[in-house]
Amino acid sequence: MTIEHLVGSAHFPDVVRLTLTLDAEYELDARLGAGSFGAVYRARALTLPASAPVYHAVKAIRKDPSRPDSVETVRREAMLHTRVTDIPGVVNVHGVWEDDEHVYIMLNYCAGGELYDWIEEDEFQGDDKHVRDIFVQILDAVRACHKKAVYHRDLKPENILCNEDGTKVYIADFGLVTDRKRSIRFGVGSAAYMSPGMSRSPDQCIGGEYNHTAYLTRSSDIWALGIILVNLIAGRNPWRTARLEDRQFWRFLGSIDEETNFWEHLGVSEELAVMLDRVFEMEPEMRLSIEEMREEVLSIRAFFAPQPVDTDPEKAVWRVACPLDASLGLHESEFLHGH
């Protein structure tokens, strides 16, 4: 079996025994994620003894001959990810290679898996210190990326990886990255984490982004950071999508007008609720900056409300759910035009 056969197939095995030669020989021994255009594998360096294995992650992306610009999309991902690879909270890029069929990106292997899984296991529930420590790491990494004009556009728990004990986190999956401060590419990313102006074309947007012909990529990342913070506290998303037809998002907008606390039913403290209202500001330039978010997060005494979470079905919310294979498919099949 060759890497071409493996990555180009419709189904990817969970565990493989396949040698791939890049800068050295590696054995691909586990599939970490897969989509229609690529797969991510755990790779063990064969130059080192099996008794003391050293692992990396290899992202293998199939070139689409029917869409020549898909190759440039992948190259842009690799180039911009490499630009920020020295940032402590970003998954390191160790090398990029190409053959006739694929582009390969070698990355740090993070043994703790996705932040999503830690949230699903309620690892943060009631632990203010853990929430603060992890979220400040995320803020610092994204802020450092922005300083280098790298805007992620797909921040979510599935794209944040953890070390083995869950004390360190790293931004990953730069498939939708851009270096442009404004973007006219709408509808990229994951719906629950998109800002209102990012999810739709300008004539369909709401709030301060209504008449804009482009959205601010920095502000859209800030919106996604706010959703991630809610995930850490509640283990849920506050709404499915930031659109008027979404019942929960409509309730949130109404709570601002009525000066009521939308966040109470998610078990969020009053201190944090005040901050979240400022993060989810409809006018993108009025949202808290990452620096302001960091200052607020460090000053908040408690993230969790003292009372139990409301279980009223009328206030139902949704579990975090956006699998990796869907993300890979979007990156390589849909995000091919515009930045």
Model-derived regions, located:
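Catalytic-loop of the protein kinase fold
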Residues: 146-163
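Juxta-kinase regulatory segment immediately upstream of eukaryotic protein kinase catalytic domains
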Residues: 1-21, 29
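Activation segment signature within eukaryotic-like protein kinase domains
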Residues: 134-135
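Conserved short submotifs of the Hanks-type protein kinase catalytic core
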Residues: 100-114, 118
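Protein kinase glycine-rich loop
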Residues: 29-36, 40
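Glycine-rich ATP phosphate-binding loop
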Residues: 39-63
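Short beta-strand micro-motifs within the conserved protein kinase catalytic domain, predominantly
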Residues: 92-101
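Regulatory extensions appended to serine/threonine kinase catalytic cores
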Residues: 305-339
